[in-house]
A protein has these predicted regions:
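C-terminal output helix
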Residues: 113, 131-142
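Short amphipathic alpha-helix used as the core "switch/output" element in two-component signaling
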Residues: 41, 58-65, 78, 84-99, ...
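Receiver (REC) domain switch/output surface
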Residues: 121, 137-150
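Active-site residues of response regulator receiver
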Residues: 26, 74-78
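Non-catalytic signal-transmission and effector/linker regions of two-component phosphorelay proteins
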Residues: 1-23, 29-50, 157-164, 171-174, ...
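Conserved Asp/Asn-Gly motif in the active-site loop of CheY-like receiver
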Residues: 51-59
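Hydrophobic/aromatic residues positioned on beta-strands within the core alpha/beta folds
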Residues: 104-107, 130
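His-Asp phosphorelay/catalytic-motif detector in bacterial-type signaling
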Residues: 19, 68-72, 96-103
Length: 216
C-alpha cells in the first residue's frame, strides 16, 4: 500500500484545502502510474486529488479502514482472483458499511463479465473497460464521482445536524412532560399545587409584554 503526498498549493501562505482522496486498486503498477499522471492536474471545487494505492483486494480494504474519508475507489475487477474487484465492492458496502465512497470498476478483459449484469447486481457507480477509458473520459468519470460523493456527504452532515437539534429540543420537552406527570393526581387532573408543576409554570415565558411568570 502506498500513500502519495498531498500536492502543494501555489501560495505557501494560504492553507491548502483538504484534497479529495482517490484510492487506485490494481495489481498492475503501470495502471497506477498512468492513472495518477492523467489526473495529476485535476481540481474540483478548489481541491486537488491525493492518491492512495493498493495492489490487491485485501490491501484495498485495509486502506479503506484506515481512511474513512476516501471519496473514490478506482477498482480493478481481476486481481488475485477473476472476481476480486467485485468481492471488494461488496465488502465495502456490506462489511465496512461505507455507502458514501464512489466505486468505479475497471477491467482489462471486458469479455470476462457482462457490464449490464454487474451494474445491476453490484452497488457500484460506474464500469469501464480500460481500453475505452481515455484521459478525457477518466477525468469526466472522476469529477462526476466526486460531485456525487460531495452531495451525499453534505446530505449526511445535514441529517446529523437536524438529529442533534431534535435531541437538544427533546430534553426540555421531556423534562416538562415528567413535571406534568409528577403533578397529576389519580384521576388524571393536573394538580397545580405540586412543587414540580409550580416550578415548570414559573419557568415559562410570560404570556404578554411585562407580564410576570405564572405562579401557583
Amino acid at each position: 500500500m502506498i500513500e502519495d503526498e498531498v500536492p502543494d498549493t501555489d501560495d505557501p501562505a494560504a492553507p491548502a484545502p483538504a484534497p479529495w482522496k482517490v484510492l487506485i486498486v490494481d495489481d498492475d503498477v503501470d495502471v497506477h502510474v498512468v492513472t495518477k499522471f492523467s489526473l495529476s492536474n485535476a481540481v474540483f471545487m478548489g481541491r486537488r486529488l491525493s492518491f492512495l494505492h493498493a495492489y490487491s483486494g485485501e490491501e484495498a480494504l485495509q486502506m479503506l479502514r484506515q481512511h474513512d474519508d476516501i471519496a473514490l475507489v478506482l477498482l480493478d475487477v481481476i486481481m488475485e482472483t477473476t472476481d476480486a474487484g467485485l468481492r471488494v465492492a461488496t465488502r465495502i458496502r456490506d462489511e465496512l458499511h461505507n455507502a458514501l465512497v464512489r466505486i468505479v470498476l475497471r477491467t482489462g478483459q471486458p469479455g470476462q463479465a457482462l457490464e449490464h449484469g454487474i451494474i445491476l447486481d453490484y452497488d457500484i457507480n460506474d464500469f469501464w473497460c480500460k481500453t475505452d477509458l481515455t484521459t478525457r473520459k477518466l477525468f469526466t468519470t472522476v469529477i462526476a464521482s466526486l460531485r456525487g460523493y460531495h452531495s451525499l456527504s453534505e446530505a449526511q452532515r445535514l441529517v446529523a445536524a437536524v438529529q442533534t437539534q431534535l435531541a437538544a429540543l427533546q430534553q426540555p420537552l421531556q423534562a416538562a412532560v415528567e413535571a406534568v406527570r409528577a403533578g397529576t393526581d389519580w384521576s388524571g387532573t393536573v394538580a397545580l399545587g405540586e412543587p414540580a408543576v409550580r416550578m415548570t409554570l414559573a419557568a415559562r415565558p410570560a404570556a404578554g409584554h411585562g407580564s410576570p411568570p405564572v405562579t401557583v
